[in-house]
Structures are given as C-alpha cells and as structure tokens.
Regions:
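Membrane-interface helix-loop junctions in multi-pass transporters/channels
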Residues: 1-135
Length: 135
C-alpha cells in the first residue's frame, strides 16, 4: 500500500472516531437531534473544532502545511474525516424542507462565520506558541 494512502487512512480513522464521539457528546448535552427538529450542534462543533485546529497548525507552522506528509495525515485524513461539509449541506436542506428556514440560515451563518473566526483565532494561538518557543 502506498505511503500516501496509509497516511490518509490513519488520519481519517482518528478524525472519524473523534467526529462520532464529539457529535454523540453534543447530542447528549443538548438532548436534541436534527431528526427531532433540533439544531445540528454536532456538525457545528466538529466544523468549528476542525477550523480551529487547522488555524493552530497553520499559525504554528506545523511543520509546513504544504508538506505532503503533513497535509495527507493531518489535513486530508484527520481534519477531512472530522469536519463535514456534506452533512452540513444536507442538514441545511433538511431544515429548509421542514419549514425551518430561519434555523437553517442560523446554522449556515454560524458554520461559516464561527468557522472563519476559529481559523483566525487558531492561527493567532499558533503564532503565540511559535513566539513563546522562539523567545
């Protein structure tokens, strides 16, 4: 098996399990599931966590996000399996089809805005770690 497939697979296993555990914990905490008319908190959480992590990695310069090994393991594998654009899209459509257009728009807005804020915040945290280690 090529090294690239092994790296993506390893990262994806960790990311998928983390996604499942975070989504389940979120559902238990809030007691709502989308099928019961609830807000898709689990999807929002995993997407924001993924954005935060990629921001931290980018700000920290771990080791170089354009490095193929790092990118395959952490970005394509781990964060690719952790975050979920397709589920986000499906849940948004499902909310709209069920007449919850306002809830869908809030979910869309939160995923996009909070996700971008998390990437930037993570980047600043990563930069802070770099400045502390170098100093």
């Amino acid at each position: 098996m090529p090294k690239s497939i092994m790296l993506v697979s390893l990262g994806a296993v960790v990311g998928a399990v983390a996604r499942y555990l975070l989504s389940e914990a979120t559902e238990r905490m809030f007691g709502h599931h989308l099928s019961e008319g609830g807000f898709p908190y689990g999807t929002l959480l995993v997407n924001v966590v993924g954005c935060l992590v990629i921001g931290i990695l980018g700000g920290w310069g771990v080791p170089d996000l354009s490095n193929s090994t790092t990118r395959l393991l952490l970005i394509t594998g781990l964060l690719g399996a952790l975050t979920t654009f397709s589920t986000f899209g499906w849940e948004s459509l499902e909310l709209m089809q069920n007449g919850k257009v306002g809830v869908a728009l809030v979910s869309i807005g939160l995923n996009v805005v909070v996700g971008l804020v998390a990437v930037y915040g993570g980047y600043l945290v990563g930069q802070y770690f770099v400045s502390e280690v170098v100093s």
